[in-house]
C-alpha cells in the first residue's frame, strides 16, 4: 500500500539523471500494483527493487504518477460506494434534509486528507531526498511491523462501516501522514489506526482505500510534469508512464480483490512476518555494499 504517499513530495531540483528502461518500467509498475494496497510499503519496495536490479532510484515522481493506475483500480472496484458518497455529499450540501451517512462520509474523507496535503507540500524536499534513504526504509519496515501486531492484539474489531465517525477519520488521516516515509505503508498506517479504534478489518481496509483517493490522485497529477524531466530519479517518456500506469491498474485491481477477501479471515500480523525478514535482508544487502543507501 505506500504506500504511501511519497506522492505529494515530488518536486523538481536541478540534477538530471538517466532515462528509465522499458523492462524497469514494467517491473516497477507490476510491483506498484502488487504492493500499493498491501501493508508492506509500495514506495519502499519500488526503491529497493530499482536500486537492487538497476542501481538507481526511479524517483518519487515516477512512483507518484504510476500510483494513478492503482488509484484508478480503487475507483473502479469501489465505484458504487464512491458514487453514493459523491451524490450524497452534493445532495446534503444543497439540502439539509438529505444529510445522511454518505454526506458525512464525504466530509470525513475531505477533512482526513488535509493533514497529508499540508505535510506533503511543506516537507516535499525532505521526503523526496533524505527520507528515501535505504537504511531508513529497512528500519521502518521492521519497526512498523510491531504496530501491526499490537493493532491486531489490542483492537476489538467490532465496529462496522456505518459506525465510522469524524474522530475515526481524523485519526486515520493523521496516520496516513506516516506514509510519507518509505517503508511505513500508507495502507498499513491507516488500517492499523482503524484497528486500534475498534473497526473491523474489512471496514478499516475499505476506508483506508477510500481515504487515499484524493491524496494519491492529487500527488500523481502534481508530479506529472516532473516525471518527464525529473531532478532526482530517472526520466520516463509519456508512453512509458502510460503503459506503467495501465500495468499498475490491472495488477492493483487484482490485489484489491485478493486483500478484501484475505482480511475477512486473516490477521494483518501475516504481513509483519514478511516485513521483518524483508527489512533485515535489505540491511544485509546495504552492509555488503550490494545496495546504495
Curated annotation (Swiss-Prot):
Single GO molecular function: undecaprenyl-diphosphatase activity
Superkingdom to which the source organism belongs: Bacteria
Catalysed conversion reaction: di-trans,octa-cis-undecaprenyl diphosphate + H2O = di-trans,octa-cis-undecaprenyl phosphate + phosphate + H(+)
EC number: 3.6.1.27
GO terms under biological process: cell wall organization; peptidoglycan biosynthetic process; regulation of cell shape; response to antibiotic
Membrane-traversing stretches: 74-94, 107-127, 134-154, 209-229, 243-263, 271-291
Keywords: Antibiotic resistance, Cell membrane, Cell shape, Cell wall biogenesis/degradation, Hydrolase, Membrane, Peptidoglycan synthesis, Transmembrane, Transmembrane helix
Function recorded in the entry: Catalyzes the dephosphorylation of undecaprenyl diphosphate (UPP). Confers resistance to bacitracin.
Protein name per its UniProtKB record: Undecaprenyl-diphosphatase
Taxonomic path: Bacteria, Bacillati, Actinomycetota, Actinomycetes, Mycobacteriales
Amino acid at each position: 500500500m505506500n504506500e504511501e504517499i511519497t506522492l505529494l513530495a515530488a518536486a523538481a531540483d536541478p540534477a538530471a539523471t538517466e532515462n528509465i528502461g522499458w523492462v524497469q518500467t514494467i517491473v516497477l509498475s507490476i510491483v506498484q500494483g502488487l504492493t500499493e494496497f498491501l501493508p508492506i510499503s509500495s514506495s519502499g519496495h519500488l526503491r529497493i527493487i530499482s536500486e537492487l536490479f538497476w542501481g538507481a532510484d526511479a524517483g518519487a515522481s515516477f512512483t507518484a504518477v504510476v500510483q494513478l493506475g492503482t488509484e484508478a483500480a480503487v475507483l473502479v472496484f469501489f465505484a458504487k460506494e464512491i458514487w453514493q458518497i459523491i451524490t450524497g455529499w452534493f445532495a446534503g450540501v444543497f439540502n439539509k434534509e438529505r444529510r445522511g451517512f454518505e454526506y458525512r462520509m464525504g466530509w470525513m474523507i475531505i477533512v482526513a486528507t488535509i493533514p497529508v496535503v499540508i505535510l506533503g507540500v511543506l516537507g516535499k524536499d525532505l521526503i523526496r531526498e533524505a527520507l528515501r534513504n535505504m537504511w531508513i526504509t529497512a528500519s521502518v519496515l521492521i519497526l512498523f511491523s510491531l504496530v501491526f501486531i499490537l493493532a491486531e492484539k489490542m483492537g476489538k474489531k467490532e465496529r462496522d462501516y456505518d459506525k465510522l465517525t469524524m474522530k475515526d477519520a481524523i485519526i486515520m488521516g493523521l496516520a496516513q501522514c506516516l506514509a510519507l516515509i518509505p517503508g511505513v505503508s500508507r495502507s498499513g498506517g491507516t488500517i492499523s489506526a482503524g484497528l486500534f479504534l475498534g473497526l473491523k478489518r474489512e471496514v478499516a481496509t475499505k476506508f483506508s482505500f477510500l481515504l487515499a483517493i484524493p491524496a494519491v490522485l492529487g500527488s500523481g497529477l502534481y508530479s506529472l510534469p516532473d516525471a518527464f524531466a525529473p531532478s532526482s530519479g530517472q526520466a520516463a517518456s509519456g508512453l512509458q508512464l502510460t503503459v506503467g500506469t495501465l500495468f499498475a491498474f490491472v495488477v492493483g485491481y487484482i490485489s484489491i480483490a485478493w486483500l478484501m477477501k484475505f482480511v475477512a479471515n486473516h490477521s494483518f500480523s501475516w504481513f509483519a512476518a514478511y516485513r521483518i525478514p524483508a527489512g533485515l535482508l535489505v540491511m544485509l544487502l546495504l552492509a555488503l555494499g550490494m545496495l546504495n543507501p
